Amino acid sequence: MTASAVLDLVKDLIARPSVTPDDVDCQMLLAQRLERIGFQCETIARGGVTNLWARRGAGAPLTVFAGHTDVVPPGPRDKWDSDPFVPTERDGFLYGRGAADMKSSIAAFVVAAEEFVAAHPEHPGSIALLITSDEEGPAVDGTVIVCDELRQRGEQLDYCIVGEPTSTEALGDVCKNGRRGSLSGRLLVKGVQGHVAYPHLARNPVHQLAPALTELVAIEWDQGNEYFPPTTFQVSNLHAGTGATNVVPGEAVALFNFRFSTASTPGQLKARVHEVLDRHGLEYQLDWELGGEPFLTPRGSLTDALVSAIQAETGLQAELSTTGGTSDGRFIARICPQVIEFGPCNATIHKVNERIELSSLAPLKNIYRRTLENLLLAD
């Protein structure tokens, strides 16, 4: 198949305005293609979210491609040089919402699977795709529930490639063999409201909170390790008061987030925060939300297969990285021992005029196909 096969499918997907969590039949289009080459396709839907599980073969190893058909809203349409849902070729790029994140990856893998099956119809092992329309949104009815379903069935995943746009300067320069965890907190410090002229009759929660936050910001939570940078603590929001300058507020709220490595656990981070707050004598309420545990795939079969495929196709030696935000890889890592993320350049994702280089579509497809060959056809 030529590069046009990938391009045609990408265009079909971009033309469907699948703003999260609406799939707009993107997955139906994929299922029709996959069923023609022997995949068994199943829709798992909940809460307005559409998920596709498509599998070909029953044996091991099971290699999975994971992705999402949903996209973020395009923002002001008048800021785009062309309609975000009318795929447009211009100056060597394909423009449209989802072009880089991540409809090109999905199209490239589907065509790669078609080529692989055509060349190896009796291939060993199994190939599957896990596609959701709830990655850009709350991510509560998407990949996570499919993983729960697969666990309950006893389906054993061996390898998973998540098609996130990981490349930075050139296709193949970076892939992600892990991600940091995310732990958020909402801290409410209680005071006593009063008149600023009579501070002895009030208790200012801002004054109480400030030294505690200063201490938390200064803490070295860990030193990271060979795979992850040190854990970070960032205050993202502060709120107190009525807007008046003559009223001592009755409460103060701080929102904060940890991005943490495998060098720390959520329990350790929580305990240390509580120790600081208690030592400062605060009257407080602290609510926690664990966005995801960190995961890591050390060098092994999957990383070697992908890095080798990238080098064969592009000549680049891919860097293994764990930087960036969270992804659905955090859910898949619970049921799959080896997870890696790889896709096109990410410079324009979530931006106006999102785009992908047309010349990268065929190499992306070839890298996915070569990775399948390395994993399933190796002696």
From Swiss-Prot:
Q: Which residues bind Zn(2+) 1?
A: 68, 101, 164
Cofactor(s) needed for function: Zn(2+); Co(2+)
GO MF assignments: acetylornithine deacetylase activity; cobalt ion binding; succinyl-diaminopimelate desuccinylase activity; zinc ion binding
Q: In which pathway does it act?
A: Amino-acid biosynthesis; L-lysine biosynthesis via DAP pathway; LL-2,6-diaminopimelate from (S)-tetrahydrodipicolinate (succinylase route): step 3/3
Q: Which UniProt keywords apply?
A: Amino-acid biosynthesis, Cobalt, Diaminopimelate biosynthesis, Hydrolase, Lysine biosynthesis, Metal-binding, Zinc
Domain of life, source organism: Bacteria
Tell me the CDD domains matching this sequence.
M20_DapE_proteobac
The positions annotated for binding Zn(2+) 2 are: 101, 136, 350
InterPro entries on file: Bact_exopeptidase_dim_dom, DapE_proteobac, Peptidase_M20, Peptidase_M20_dimer, Peptidase_M20A
Indicate the residues that form the catalytic site: 70, 135
Q: What class of enzyme is it?
A: hydrolase
- EC number(s) on file: 3.5.1.18
What is this enzyme's catalytic activity, as reactions?
N-succinyl-(2S,6S)-2,6-diaminopimelate + H2O = (2S,6S)-2,6-diaminopimelate + succinate
Q: How are cofactors bound according to the entry's free-text note?
A: Binds 2 Zn(2+) or Co(2+) ions per subunit.
Q: Name one GO biological process term.
A: L-arginine biosynthetic process
Q: Which Pfam families match?
A: M20_dimer, Peptidase_M20
Q: Which family does it belong to?
A: Belongs to the peptidase M20A family. DapE subfamily.
Q: Give the quaternary structure.
A: Homodimer.
Question: What's its job?
Answer: Catalyzes the hydrolysis of N-succinyl-L,L-diaminopimelic acid (SDAP), forming succinate and LL-2,6-diaminopimelate (DAP), an intermediate involved in the bacterial biosynthesis of lysine and meso-diaminopimelic acid, an essential component of bacterial cell walls.
Q: What's the name of the protein? A: Succinyl-diaminopimelate desuccinylase
The organism of origin for this protein: Bordetella bronchiseptica (strain ATCC BAA-588 / NCTC 13252 / RB50) (Alcaligenes bronchisepticus)
The gene coding this protein: dapE
